Regions:
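N-terminal beta1-alpha1 cap of cysteine-dependent amidohydrolase-like domains
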Residues: 1-100, 114, 119-120, 127, ...
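DNA-recognition element of transcription regulators
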Residues: 136-140
Length: 197
């Protein structure tokens, strides 16, 4: 059975005139196409009180919180993603957080972040048995992870790279699967587990 996943968007500006827009990277669309995934909608940065009706109308049963920007840079996005996480928690919906999205999942339960050096526009190993290297585009990392999460992967400098909730079907990673072509088999499974029930 397919699920409908709502994908968070980031604030972007029009070139040449003043207009705020909600957008996602085209890398996501390419990734979805390569995996034959078409059961998604974009989640514009609406007022939080509109979210439940929007999700009910579109039969949303999961969220993908994308990367981009630092938490607290776009307050409207922060509020909407917190509302989405509240809805997901109440209904036990699937959530996948990528980069900023993983930080948001941790923050939702009281986690904190801190700045980190050496994680922008680079690749580094994670501590899994395959000695996999992942891309890295972030300047913040999780500082204090709430007890309700377990760490799946860490980088060589001990930064948290991937987490999962101990009860809820929530997962997060700091790397960007949409930026690796072809997609790594591990990330392919991660995406399929979110988009297919």
């Amino acid at each position: 059975m397919s699920s409908t996943i709502a994908i968070s968007t980031r604030l972007s500006s029009a070139i040449g005139y003043e207009e705020e827009r909600d957008s996602i990277s085209r890398d996501w669309i390419k990734l979805f196409s390569s995996l034959s995934i078409n059961n998604y909608i974009l989640l514009p940065n609406m007022e939080a009180n509109m979210l439940k009706k929007y999700c009910n109308y579109h039969s949303v049963n999961g969220f993908l919180l994308t990367g981009g920007d630092v938490i607290e840079k776009d307050i409207a996005r922060d509020k909407l993603e917190f509302a989405a996480l509240n809805l997901a928690k109440d209904k036990c919906l699937k959530v996948l957080g990528i980069c900023r999205g993983m930080q948001m999942i941790s923050s939702f339960f009281g986690g904190t972040i801190k700045s980190v050096d050496g994680h922008i526009a680079t690749r580094h190993r994670i501590n899994d048995s395959s000695s996999r290297t992942v891309n890295s585009y972030h300047s913040y990392t999780i500082d204090n992870l709430p007890e309700c999460f377990k760490v799946i992967y860490r980088s060589n400098d001990n930064s948290i790279e991937s987490i999962s909730h101990k009860i809820l079907p929530w997962y997060g990673c700091m790397w960007h699967p949409e930026r690796d072509q072809p997609i790594h088999p591990m990330d392919k499974e991660m995406m399929k587990s979110l988009f297919i029930i």
